[in-house]
Structures are given as C-alpha cells and as structure tokens.
Amino acid sequence: LVFKITRVVKEYKGLKPGSGLGFSVILKECLRKTIGHGKVPEILGTEISILYYGLFAWKRPKQSGENVFTAYKKSGYGSIVGGLAFLSLSEVLAFHVLFMQISIVAAWIIFVLNLYGIIFILADFNASRREPTYIKDEKLYINAGIRWKAVVPVKDIKSIELSNESLRGKKILRAMTILSGPNLVIELEKTHRADGPYGIRKNFDKVLLNPDEPRRFRQLIIDTF
C-alpha cells in the first residue's frame, strides 16, 4: 500500500508542472497508471478530489488569460454556496440533536451523509474556481466543478448561441455551476463523451454553459473556427 501511494505521489509530481490540468484530472490519471483502469481509481479519485476541494483548496486561484473563462464571479455563486452551506449545517446539527433522542446510530449516519453533502457542494464550488473552462490548441476544455469534464475540438462545434433557455434531453451536457442557469448553448457536429464522478460517462451533442463573459467566450470560439 505504501509503495502504491509513493508511486501515485511520484506520478502526480511528474504530471503537474506546466500541465495546465487540474488536481482531479491529474490525480485520476496517476491512479490509473498506478492501480490500473476500472472503477477503483475512478472512485478513489472522486472521493479524494471531493475532500481536497471541499476542505483544503481555499487559496485564491491564479488562472488567468484571454482563453480562460470562469463561471462563478458574476452569478454570486460563492455567496449562494456560503449561505446554503451555513443553513444546511445549522439544519444538520438541529436534526442530529433530535435523532440522538431516537437512535444514536441513525443520528450519526444521517449526520455523516448530510455533512458529506455539504462538503460536496463546497468541493464543486472550489473546483469551479480552480479548474475553469478554457480553450487551448483549438480544443475546448469543459470543466463543470467536480461533476463533468470534457474535451471538444473547436472544429466539431456546429453553432454557439447566447441563450438562457434550459433545454432538456438525454444528450445535453449541463456544464453550469450548481444553482445557475445557462447563458450559452453549444451544438456539436457529432456526439462526444464527458467524464463524471465515480467513473460515470455521458454522451452529449449539446452543451449548456454559464461563463461570466458569455459574449467574449462566444466570439473567441467563432474566431477559432
């Protein structure tokens, strides 16, 4: 086990410098190289990423540049998440005291599950901050918090339109921040695949996004065609 952990750390240090990739992407790649492909590295990578982003990744992100697009500043996402986390924690503590009078085991199970939910929301927010969507080498790197990640060649984009319409369908990737609606709709020439938590995969041919600068984002995509 110690040998495996040492190999993961070594692989991580080897991939991280100048890669431009986020923590969760590099971590899962290191786990796949060390443990092998399958559910185990996907589950481990997701759980470690949730704990890292939910509890430790609070330093202000340094990402900047004309090809990098955040999706949390203008929507008030941080304030919403902070308020939601505070209210949820207050409710969790209140329910914990109540259930302790009924069943200690049930009280602790409910407490842990609810606390995990709060950590997940915080992790998704921090992942949105530290792993923004960006364009590089004529490819669109879509990062939706801790939930979805996908890479789409710009040449495969059929259209990109300003829209706040929340479309429905099986092949629609909702790459917005939690609690936010879209302001951009991207239609693709063909189906692509997104990677989600715990090894979940999703095929999509439309993407809903909510970058802080939708018009600049759209224009940069058009200029890259």
Question: Which positions does each model-derived feature cover?
Answer:
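Juxtamembrane/interface segments at transmembrane-helix termini
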Residues: 2-21, 123-134
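Beta-strand-rich cores of mature extracytoplasmic or soluble domains
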Residues: 72-77, 184-225
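Alpha-helical transmembrane segments of integral membrane proteins
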Residues: 80-87, 107-113, 205
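Non-transmembrane, membrane-adjacent beta-strand/coil modules in membrane-associated proteins
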Residues: 144-206
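N-terminal membrane-targeting/pre-transmembrane regions
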Residues: 9-102
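Single-pass alpha-helical transmembrane signal-anchor segments
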Residues: 95, 109-125
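Conserved beta-hairpin
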Residues: 118-161
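Hydrophobic alpha-helical transmembrane segments
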Residues: 1, 101-115
